[in-house]
């Protein structure tokens, strides 16, 4: 088949036009994609630092602090207040009991001193009588008086030691109960009695 010169020239002239049209369409697509791409990026500001979000951020911050304050005032603070009030009552009871035990100890000491004074007076009178009755009888009576004095002294010391031991035992038990109550109220856990006892003993040993 032969192609005429006019047809070949027409085909050659129309080819650049179609090529230019294709390039124009591609550029248009690229331009539209670029616009969409740039629009997708937006302003590029980190949302927490964007001034348009300040109002909502302040609102949520106020709501969060309000809920936190409500939780503290309705749950945490009443529990702590109850524990402190219970501890205050226990301390008052401990002080009253300690005062009573101290009064008992003072009474026991006063009775011991009175008995000691009487025993010394009796020993002095026995010594005076020994000059008349003889040294042998005086020594025997003195030994008897000293034995009685020693027995009464030992009895008084045992009474005082028992009172002090009871006081320390009561204070230790109260401290263990109070610590267990505080742990249960604040942490919601049941404290092991042995662990609480060891902790109280360690504190008392460090303060001794």
UniProtKB/Swiss-Prot annotation:
GO terms, molecular function: proton-transporting ATP synthase activity, rotational mechanism; proton-transporting ATPase activity, rotational mechanism
Residue ranges annotated as compositionally biased, kind Polar residues, are 1-18
TM segments? 56-78
Entry keyword set: ATP synthesis, Cell inner membrane, Cell membrane, CF(0), Hydrogen ion transport, Ion transport, Membrane, Transmembrane, Transmembrane helix, Transport
UniProt membrane topology term: Single-pass membrane protein
In which family does this protein belong, per the annotation?
Answer: Belongs to the ATPase B chain family.
> Which NCBIfam families is this protein grouped with?
PRK09174.1
**What's the subunit arrangement here?**
F-type ATPases have 2 components, F(1) - the catalytic core - and F(0) - the membrane proton channel. F(1) has five subunits: alpha(3), beta(3), gamma(1), delta(1), epsilon(1). F(0) has three main subunits: a(1), b(2) and c(10-14). The alpha and beta chains form an alternating ring which encloses part of the gamma chain. F(1) is attached to F(0) by a central stalk formed by the gamma and epsilon chains, while a peripheral stalk is formed by the delta and b chains.
Supply the name of the protein. ATP synthase subunit b
**Species annotation:** Brucella melitensis biotype 1 (strain ATCC 23456 / CCUG 17765 / NCTC 10094 / 16M)
